[in-house]
Amino acid sequence: MRLGGPVFVESDDPEVLARAHRDLGYRAAYTPGGLTAGDTARIKAVRDAFAKHDVIIAETGVWNNLMDPDEDARRKNLSAVIEGLALAEELGSLCCVNIAGGFSASFWAGPHPKNFSQAAFDLAVENARTIIDAVKPKTAKFTYEMMPHMIPDSASRYLDLVQAVDRDAFGVHLDAVNAINSPYAYYDTTAVIRECFEKLGEHVVSCHLKDISMEDDITVRLTEVLAGQGGFDIRSYVSGVAGLAHKPPLMLEHLKSPAEYERAREHVLSVARDIGVSFDD
């Protein structure tokens, strides 16, 4: 299995970046910044350096709103994701990932009453097909990240999308913490995780790994926290990934400093050791 996360180095040298990942025990990486599709020499340098050090590129993130209410913005966002998938294909990244999007005009990843509508589902399908058909990737997948207040918000809804998009190049980016969007889910994260792997396992390309806590308050407040400080069943999550034949990478994210990433990494490694899972092979 492979664990990955951001590295904090002041260099854009591919060799330095690749070694920085291995120095942290990472064998998976996010796409380095500054790359664009068609930059053949730079892309080759990154591919060669990362392959030399046995570090795979887990995902190429393009974060925008593919359902932006502004039509001009939506078209520009769609073009950016098409370029992102083209880059992922050239780079050898496992996937290009974005959110499916929503109808909020105030926040690109915000809630909206129509985010779970049939119109949203149909647009998510249309956008995925448009992106994939424009690039026609042979290896990289296009994926949506699971989100708590827009589709796909659950394993079942993600499976519906996989079936509706009906493209071999459409895969699953698994972030099961984002499917913890109610007290019911929070108090049985194990069941949420189990459903994700049962319904989506064969389609999973890359996974985010973090934790979540429900705060003491009258209203429901769910907050991302450092791995090991919340209620997410990391043990079951790591075990679920390890149980997949193709062993998709696990990627740490959304932490504030190298020190926090180190603490999260050590916790995940400790959990993995307890269940007999190795990130070294």
Model-inferred region functions:
Residues 15, 52, 71-172:
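Active-site acidic/histidine proton-transfer and metal-coordination neighborhood
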Residues 21, 29, 50, 77, ...:
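Conserved, mostly hydrophobic/aromatic
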Residues 2-7, 29-31, 57-62, 96-98, ...:
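Hydrophobic faces of well-ordered beta-strands that scaffold small-molecule active sites
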Residues 1-4, 58-67, 103-111:
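N-terminal small/glycine-rich loop or linker at the start of catalytic domains
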Residues 29, 60, 126-226, 231, ...:
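Acidic/histidine-rich catalytic cores of soluble enzymes
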Residues 261-280:
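C-terminal helical cap(s) of enzyme catalytic domains, especially alpha/beta-barrels
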Residues 17-24, 38-59, 83-92, 129-137, ...:
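Acidic (Asp/Glu)-rich catalytic clusters
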Residues 7-15, 31-43, 65-72, 104, ...:
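Acidic-and-aromatic substrate-binding clefts and catalytic sites of carbohydrate-active enzymes
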